[in-house]
Amino acid sequence: MAPKAEKKPVAEKAEKTTAAKKTKAEKRPPASKEGGDKKGKKKSKKSVETYKIYIFKVLKQVHPDIGISSKAMSIMNSFINDIFEKLAGESAKLARYNKKPTITSREIQTSVRLVLPGELAKHAVSEGTKAVTKFTSA
């Protein structure tokens, strides 16, 4: 009879371990009736801003007969984001060095000269100056 007495605690121990090893689904409380009805509600998409339409407009101005693949468009978008981050970072450094709280067109112009090489910087500065004068006159 002694062996039977020893088996009972083992059986109780097995029940405890199975209760402790419940799956995540079993541990979760049942879903409420209010939260379960999601058919009527649509999930709003997070808007992602890209330069794709502007890249396409410039492409059509320069080469109206040429298209661009989605992968090339994605690469161009990444390129513009990268250049923007570099220019913004350099402009912020310049403003900090000069102890100015704002980034002006002067900081942007200087950062363009520092970030972009040679002839490309000259063209970018002239186009930027032209855009700023057009903006202020309008």
From Swiss-Prot:
UniProtKB keywords: Acetylation, Chromosome, DNA-binding, Isopeptide bond, Nucleosome core, Nucleus, Ubl conjugation
Disulfide bonds: none
Record's GO cellular component terms: nucleosome; nucleus
Main location: nucleus
Tree of life domain: Eukaryota
PTM comment: Can be acetylated to form H2BK6ac and H2BK33ac.
Biased composition (Basic and acidic residues): 1-18, 26-38
Gene Ontology molecular functions: DNA binding; protein heterodimerization activity; structural constituent of chromatin
InterPro entries for this protein: Histone-fold, Histone_H2A/H2B/H3, Histone_H2B, HISTONE_H2B_site
Subcellular location per the Swiss-Prot or TrEMBL entry: Nucleus; Chromosome
Cross-link (Glycyl lysine isopeptide (Lys-Gly) (interchain with G-Cter in ubiquitin)): 134
Modified residues (N6-acetyllysine): 7, 27
Protein's job: Core component of nucleosome. Nucleosomes wrap and compact DNA into chromatin, limiting DNA accessibility to the cellular machineries which require DNA as a template. Histones thereby play a central role in transcription regulation, DNA repair, DNA replication and chromosomal stability. DNA accessibility is regulated via a complex set of post-translational modifications of histones, also called histone code, and nucleosome remodeling.
Subunit description: The nucleosome is a histone octamer containing two molecules each of H2A, H2B, H3 and H4 assembled in one H3-H4 heterotetramer and two H2A-H2B heterodimers. The octamer wraps approximately 147 bp of DNA.
Additional record remark: Phosphorylation of H2B was not detected.
Family statement drawn from the similarity comment of this UniProt entry: Belongs to the histone H2B family.
Protein name (record): Histone H2B.3
Organism whose genome encodes this protein: Triticum aestivum
